[in-house]
């Protein structure tokens, strides 16, 4: 074992980790950025929380890194309590050691299956964070029911992004009841949110995303729970299907029904709230969290202001129109000079969000080449 630091927290973790289910206790150092962002986003949610008690649950605790960082780093004037669970007795032992290391008394540890822990606490938690190895689907129903408190927050991660991005079409249909679209990584998180919205609606619960990102091998989202059939109906209205023709997307509402050639359903509404993003960015900066977490939050703070589902991949677009790829910064400059909004995206170095149409981009790239060459 070794002791490391993440954020403002000390953690005892395995000396070596294979990052697989074979590990005695699971700890992924590559997810420090994920945890930095998670603490920042939940802090932004907590800043607007107006009750005296704040109850959180991390039912898939592993080494306890996520839940312990919540317990140690979240600032709240009331009573903040965190429940951490894991089915693995070795993990439970390590979680307890990490609690002692940080001298925390606001955490309760459970040696229990995640679904059992969540099902025992129906309508109890203000925040449930599902961070599994693989897909969150096996835990989603229990997570929704456990976070049914008015204005609760459901956080979830999917590390099966190859499935969500279309590499395993049949698996996606089977697990998420949706047809994936290859290419744009943002659609992975939109597909995951769409599935969660459908699952929650059967309990007359609407889910409203307040922050989402796709980083490395995972998709991550934070969704506020809104009670009532009307809220569920409103959430469903944000679902729809996408058809990709060359570089152009066509859309159909969920209510219109599936049509051959389309993919989805995806969540087509806003997936990150500008105020939450900005507050999360300030939190990450003020606490000296990892530079990478700050960089991701800064990009999302810009891209979330542009209403576009997915992005334009300049590399793919130039390949399609048989042009050399200009510097992305030059394209951005030309778009701005022509009155368009534009931003890089956090998940693709060649990706741009813009209110320009595909035809506008083609013209600007062609004009760039005619002037340059």
UniProtKB/Swiss-Prot annotation:
The Trm1 methyltransferase domain, residue ranges: 2-365
Reaction(s) this enzyme catalyzes, per UniProt: guanosine(26) in tRNA + 2 S-adenosyl-L-methionine = N(2)-dimethylguanosine(26) in tRNA + 2 S-adenosyl-L-homocysteine + 2 H(+)
Top class in the EC scheme: transferase
InterPro entries, sorted: SAM-dependent_MTases_sf, Trm1, TRM1_arc_bac, tRNA_met_Trm1_C
Alphabetical GO biological process terms: tRNA N2-guanine methylation
Keywords noted in UniProt: Methyltransferase, RNA-binding, S-adenosyl-L-methionine, Transferase, tRNA processing, tRNA-binding
Enzyme Commission number(s) from the entry: 2.1.1.216
Entries under Pfam families matching the protein: TRM (PF02005)
GO MF assignments: tRNA (guanine(26)-N2)-dimethyltransferase activity; tRNA binding
Binding-site list for S-adenosyl-L-methionine: 35, 66, 86, 113-114
Function field: Dimethylates a single guanine residue at position 26 of a number of tRNAs using S-adenosyl-L-methionine as donor of the methyl groups.
NCBIfam families membership: TRM1 (TIGR00308)
PANTHER family attached to this UniProt entry: N 2 ,N 2 -DIMETHYLGUANOSINE TRNA METHYLTRANSFERASE (PTHR10631), TRNA (GUANINE(26)-N(2))-DIMETHYLTRANSFERASE (PTHR10631:SF3)
Family under the similarity heading: Belongs to the class I-like SAM-binding methyltransferase superfamily. Trm1 family.
Protein name: tRNA (guanine(26)-N(2))-dimethyltransferase
Record organism: Methanococcus maripaludis (strain C6 / ATCC BAA-1332)
Gene name of this polypeptide: trm1
